[in-house]
């Protein structure tokens, strides 16, 4: 039944026979899609340079864009795995909130102060991973549709975050923690380095390992994957746990950026992450995914937001532009899918 | 125009600085004439000031009015260039907006943070970069993060509302008083409720029924409908927020009840018009100025240009300005209507 849940794509099954040829077609079209994304990003940057000149092309401004992209970027890389595996996770923002709160309680901070700040990092990762595990088990073994299971987690995790924090903002007073994450490596902020490492690791994991191949198989056709000897349920649990860990890491980054943990952190991150993944070229129905595309997707949205900020543009125009980009990306995707699928 | 400004700056202000402790909030009116000269001096165009402005998403009337009032205020000065960025409830995004201002080397940043504590690190960074940061409404958790802070008086709102209800219900110790709070998690809501309870206790009353909404029309309707079900008879209701009050009023109309009077909060124009017309359940509202951002713009300009606050003897802009929370009734509504916000 995990098959059923994982497979939204029953209307467009990938024939097992053709999988070889589709893989090669996929590779080429994926490259093509990435070219499109690069072009889009370059156009955006051109728009930035033309409208804002030196203010846009400044090193500090580029770092500002990257720092903004880092937190949501880590979540989006994890989301790429889940969506490629035929799932969806609406609870990522809530998991970020819960992890950030749990890692900044007085108890955790006290422990961190008496031992080492890394305690906070492990706490956030453990909480995020556990949430992902619960999601995965509910979906794979509890046979709850992913959309519903993670919708429930969204409500529950944010509620729990509010209970733990008593709906207050928790301020971090662990000196080593702030010092570590505020630092730069060769001029690149640590947060950006973390994003780069996560993206690189994600790319290797998805494209160069058995785990990655299984993810494509499970997302493309779970039944075929099962017949091929893949433990689809176990793999589904792993995918959601991986995303949970990414959320925990994103929470650590957000704590570092804000020096706080709060139940309001990560608001609507699920939409931002899914949007970045989808415009990156990963199919919402599963079976195809690209980490590079996701990274470009995140960068396109954050650059867009930056260009709008620099140009003093209205509060609502940016949302309209974002919506338009998503629609264009999905329309393009459907055309590509039709061409290669049928 | 000078008169309007005086009203806002002097009349409705409590100056929360030590050096003004002697003057307090006493100068209510009568000052517009003799101090006019000082104000004109301050209004003279000085060196160009670039101000960055960032606030949370304009998802209710009060918050929208904050940004609009700030823009309007900046428009009055030829020496102010205001850069307004998209209002957001995502602290990660708001931090990057402030970083952009720092990169741009603006002269001042007027910041109404979504979460004061979360925006503190980046505000500190801006101050270290030599930028004058003016903190509005929601306070940072470090005194070094802002040159000056403009605050509304949430506790005072509760006190004002409670005191007014005490006066109206004089001598009735069995009166049923209900409270419709805003977002319960926010410290500002807790402050308002605390002040309200204290003022009521002062005259032997207490809050009999309390519900919480979320500053939105929809949540106000829901909370009020529940409240009216829970309490068969009510004498007075204090609703924290006039934006959610639109929903509260709708729920009251649906219930057909009218045995009580209502006191609003924040001070929206439509509630003030209702008070003026005296044709609804609102008999009063307590102001939480939506012109705080505009005051922030003025303070930023003065601080950067090295000018002083006109009516003070002190030559520097104060560290903190806490605005007063007056009760608006039919008698004095005309004074507050011009600066009220549309919800």
Per-range role (PLM):
Chain B
Residues 11, 23-24, 31-49, 180, ...:
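Hinge/cleft segment of the Venus flytrap/periplasmic-binding protein
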Residues 18-21:
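C-terminal motif of bacterial Sec signal peptides marking the signal peptidase cleavage site
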Residues 33-77, 82-100, 106, 112-116, ...:
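Extracytoplasmic "Venus flytrap"
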Residues 111-128, 196, 213-273:
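Hydrophobic alpha-helical
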Residues 117-156, 176, 269-281:
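Flexible loop/hinge segments that line or gate small-molecule binding clefts
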């Amino acid at each position: 039944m995990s098959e059923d849940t994982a497979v939204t794509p029953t209307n467009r099954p990938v024939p097992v026979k053709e999988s070889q040829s589709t893989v090669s077609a996929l590779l080429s079209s994926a490259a093509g899609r990435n070219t499109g994304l690069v072009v889009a990003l370059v156009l955006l940057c051109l728009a930035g340079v033309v409208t804002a000149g030196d203010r846009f092309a400044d090193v500090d401004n580029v770092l500002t864009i990257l720092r903004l992209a880092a937190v949501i970027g880590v979540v989006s890389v994890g989301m790429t795995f889940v969506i490629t595996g035929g799932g969806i996770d609406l609870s990522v923002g809530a998991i970020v909130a819960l992890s950030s709160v749990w890692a900044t309680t007085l108890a955790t901070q006290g422990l961190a102060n008496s031992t080492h700040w890394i305690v906070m990092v492990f706490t956030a990762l453990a909480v995020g991973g556990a949430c992902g595990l619960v999601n995965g088990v509910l979906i794979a073994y509890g046979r709850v549709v992913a959309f519903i299971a993670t919708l429930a987690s969204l409500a529950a995790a944010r509620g729990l975050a509010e209970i733990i924090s008593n709906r207050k903002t928790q301020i971090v007073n662990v000196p080593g923690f702030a010092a570590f994450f505020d630092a730069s490596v060769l001029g690149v902020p640590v947060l950006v380095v973390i994003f780069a490492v996560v993206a690189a690791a994600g790319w290797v994991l998805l494209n160069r390992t058995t785990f990655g191949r299984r993810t494509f198989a499970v997302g493309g056709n779970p039944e075929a994957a099962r017949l091929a000897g893949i433990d689809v349920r176990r793999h589904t649990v792993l995918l959601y746990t991986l995303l949970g860990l990414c959320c925990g890491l994103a929470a650590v980054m957000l704590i570092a950026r804000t020096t706080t943990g709060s139940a309001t952190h990560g608001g609507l991150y699920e939409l931002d992450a899914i949007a970045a993944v989808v415009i990156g070229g990963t199919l919402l129905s599963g079976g195809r995914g690209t980490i590079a595309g996701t990274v470009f997707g995140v960068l396109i949205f954050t650059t867009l937001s930056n260009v709008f900020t620099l140009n003093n543009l209205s509060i609502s125009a940016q949302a309209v532009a974002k919506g338009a980009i998503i629609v264009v990306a999905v329309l393009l995707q459907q055309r590509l899918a039709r061409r290669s699928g049928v | 125009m000078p008169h309007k400004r005086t009203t806002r700056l002097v009349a409705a202000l409590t100056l929360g600085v030590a050096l003004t402790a002697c003057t307090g909030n006493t100068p209510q009116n009568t000052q517009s004439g003799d101090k006019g000269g000082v104000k004109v001096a301050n209004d003279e165009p000085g060196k160009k000031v670039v101000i960055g402005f960032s606030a949370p998403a304009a998802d209710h009337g009060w918050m929208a009015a904050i940004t609009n009032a700030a823009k309007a205020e900046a428009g009055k000065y030829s020496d102010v260039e205001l850069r307004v960025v998209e209002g957001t409830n995502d602290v990660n995004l708001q931090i990057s907006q402030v970083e952009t201002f720092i990169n741009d080397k603006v002269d001042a940043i007027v910041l109404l943070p979504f979460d004061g504590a979360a925006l503190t690190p980046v505000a500190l960074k801006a101050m270290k970069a030599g930028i004058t940061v003016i903190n509005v409404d929601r306070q940072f958790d470090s005194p070094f993060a802002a040159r000056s802070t403009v605050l509304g008086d949430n506790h005072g709102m509760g006190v004002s509302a409670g005191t007014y209800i005490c006066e109206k219900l004089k001598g009735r110790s069995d009166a049923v008083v209900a409270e419709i709070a805003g977002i319960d998690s926010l410290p500002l809501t807790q402050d308002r409720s605390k002040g309200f309870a204290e003022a009521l206790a002062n005259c032997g009353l207490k809050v009999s029924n309390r519900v919480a909404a979320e500053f939105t029309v929809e949540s106000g309707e829901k909370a009020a409908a529940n409240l009216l079900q829970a309490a068969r008879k009510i004498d007075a209701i204090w609703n924290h927020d006039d934006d959610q009050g639109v929903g509260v009023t709708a729920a009251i109309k649906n219930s057909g009840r009218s045995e009580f009077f209502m006191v609003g909060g924040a001070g929206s124009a439509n509630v003030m018009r209702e008070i003026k017309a005296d044709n609804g359940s609102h008999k009063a509202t307590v102001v939480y100025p939506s012109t705080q951002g505009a005051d922030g713009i003025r303070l930023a300009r003065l601080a950067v240009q090295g000018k002083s606050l006109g009516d003070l003897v002190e030559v520097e802009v104060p560290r903190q300005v806490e605005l007063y929370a007056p009760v608006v009734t039919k008698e004095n509504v005309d004074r507050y209507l011009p600066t009220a916000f549309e919800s």
